[in-house]
Amino acid sequence: MIWNNDDTEHSTGGLYRWTMDALFGRQISPSRKFKEVSQDDTNYNMKSHKDKQWDGHGFQPRTRSSSASFDRSFLQRYELLQDEEEQDIMRPVRSPARPYLSAGHAAGQDAALANDESTDTFSNKRQRFKGKFSGPKYHDESLKFRAPAKNDPFISKLFQRESPEHPSNLPGKFPSPFKQALGLPAGVQVQLDPEEQIPQKMFTDEYLQLLAELDQNGQKLKQLQQGLHQKQQDHILQETSYREKYHVMRQELITELKQSKKLYDNYYRLYEKHKKMRALDTDASRLRQRISDLEAQVVDASIEKAEEVRKLNETIFQLEFREQETQSKHERERIRYQSRIAELESIVESRLSISNGVQNPPLRERIKPVNSSARI
């Protein structure tokens, strides 16, 4: 049952509590827990690493296998290039190195450009990974960026940096005019020949082509930013749509849960009624058995009574038959007695009439009341 606290794999207790926590805000919802875990995975920092907890138990979050992943085994397997700590390759374009700029001024300009996050595309990424690649295994000299030398023929040809023509009468390396100026006392100026001065840069077709490519790259970067902004807007709209769908599904799930609760309540109500009916049915079965026993007893008693009635009827019939026989016997005897009495009366009357010579009523009439009263 889903109402118990059994969280085994064959039970739905955990699913029920998971749903109720998500709907009614008890403890913490799964969506919020997933959001926290996802945010921790995205903003993971090795310095502030803390063990994740889920229901009081520690767990290891799943890492992503990509070049920007927190799992360094991917970089070790495929030997990917590390992110650049400093973008020295962009400095000649944004801030050309000039010999007359001081080192402090150039460093301040580079720091200002480095702190400008609005124009630095990779600033956030560099800041995010800054400090994570500080171990000895990340200091591979073969992967570090090396600025090209000033006497690189490709750079010299690209920016048309001409090599100065030194006088042939000076042996050895031609001395630098800046070093000589540093060695002179204050207020002393060195006059250099126009032929010995450092030639100025010339904006050639290659340089203009490089600027055009930079402009095209800027346009492409702008288009990329617009596309990224559009994707972000689409992502926001998609999240809004997902949120609306989530609320709709959440409301539907709440309705389904309420209906399920109502269904379970009705089920348990019917189950209680079923139990009562089973108890009543047990009592009814006992009563039916009692009725059957009583009916059997009634049938047996009826049979016994019928047998007794039959026997009594037979006895009555026999008695009636005997009575009829007795009555018929008495009737025959009465008739025989009456005939004998009549005969005797006639004899007596004849004798009396002869002896007295007087006509008297018949003897029958004189003795009839006496005989009648005697018979009664």
UniProtKB/Swiss-Prot annotation:
Q: Does the keyword Coiled coil apply?
A: yes
Q: Which GO terms describe its cellular component?
A: cytoplasm; spindle pole body
Q: Where is this region: Disordered?
A: 34-67, 103-134
Compartments (UniProt record): Cytoplasm, Cytoskeleton, Microtubule organizing center, Spindle pole body
Q: Where is the composition biased (Low complexity)?
A: 103-114
Residues in a coiled coil are: 204-350
Cytoplasm as a keyword of this entry, yes or no, is yes
- Classification via InterPro entries: Bbp1_C (IPR029330), Bbp1_N (IPR029328)
The UniProt keyword set, sorted, is: Coiled coil, Cytoplasm, Cytoskeleton
- Superkingdom of the organism of origin: Eukaryota
- Report the leader peptide range: none
Subunit-structure text: Homodimer.
In UniProt terms, what function does this protein have?
A: Component of the spindle pole body (SPB) required for insertion of the nascent SPB into the nuclear envelope and for the proper execution of spindle pole body (SPB) duplication. Connects the central plaque of the SPB with the half-bridge. Required for proper localization of CDC5 at the SPB and for proper M-phase progression.
User: Record's family?
Assistant: Belongs to the BBP1 family.
Name the UniProt record assigns to this protein? Spindle pole component BBP1
Q: Which source organism?
A: Lachancea thermotolerans (strain ATCC 56472 / CBS 6340 / NRRL Y-8284) (Yeast)
Q: Which gene encodes it?
A: BBP1
